């Protein structure tokens, strides 16, 4: 249902005094949403083959590009399998996070988030890139340093190593209620790209710092904005309220 909604929704607004119609550019296949829909916590207990079944069902009802939440990607061998299967299914990109398996949801309170060593994660990226057939399929690294309470320098060092490993883009994650730290990262990320003579997209997920606009994020240097799990969150609340009236 989310795939159908994202595929067909069109919102009319104004831009520079002119009426414009806007649509979603792509679909985010969320691990949290997929797990919750099956009654499981978001801790990588849902098997990849089960996730793949959901992915194929969504792709059957949409022609939008799909970005898949790949959790940690497992070990390098498992990630090769993931990349191969997702590419064959028609997925456009996979995002994997640099936590150790099994991961815990980044917004879960009171949980210690353990990160994988950047050298190990970089090797996983290399293995994934080596197995893909098409140059169009993207592997994006999700940096969890700020989620884990690490300093900005840790996030930037990880970004540098992952870019040198051949990753196609970087996602910086934060659970802060204001966007200051991700904007700081974005500015310093551009310096890294210039030093490496690269052009790689930057991704964010403004779930907690949701007052900032797309235009402001774009001006800060972000290329992709993911609105994660919003349809599930609103559907859950609506179903709870309806259930109370039955």
List each language-model region with its residue ranges:
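Alpha/beta enzyme core
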Residues: 1-223, 227, 234
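Extended, intrinsically disordered, low-complexity segments
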Residues: 230-246
């Amino acid at each position: 249902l989310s795939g159908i909604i994202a595929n067909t929704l069109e919102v009319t607004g104004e831009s520079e005094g002119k009426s414009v119609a806007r649509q979603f550019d792509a679909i985010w296949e969320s691990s949290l949403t997929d797990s919750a829909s099956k009654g499981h916590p978001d801790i990588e207990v849902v098997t990849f083959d089960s996730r793949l079944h959901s992915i194929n069902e969504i792709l059957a009802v949409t022609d939008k590009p799909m970005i898949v939440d790949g959790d940690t990607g497992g070990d390098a061998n498992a990630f090769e399998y993931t990349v191969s299967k997702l590419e064959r299914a028609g997925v456009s990109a996979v995002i994997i996070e640099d936590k150790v398996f099994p991961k815990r949801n980044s917004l879960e309170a009171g949980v210690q988030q353990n990160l994988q060593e950047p050298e190990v994660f970089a090797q996983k990226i290399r293995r994934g890139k080596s197995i893909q057939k098409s140059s169009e399929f993207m592997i994006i690294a999700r940096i969890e340093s700020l989620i884990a309470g690490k300093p900005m320098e840790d996030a930037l060092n990880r970004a540098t190593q992952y870019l040198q490993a051949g990753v196609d883009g970087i996602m910086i994650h934060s659970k802060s209620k204001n966007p200051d730290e991700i904007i700081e990262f974005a500015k310093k990320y551009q310096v890294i790209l210039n030093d490496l003579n690269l052009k790689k997209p930057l991704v964010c997920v403004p779930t907690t710092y949701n007052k900032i606009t797309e235009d402001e994020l774009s001006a800060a240097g972000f290329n992709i904005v993911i609105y994660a799990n919003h349809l599930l969150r609103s559907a859950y609340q609506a179903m709870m309220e309806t259930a109370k009236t039955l």
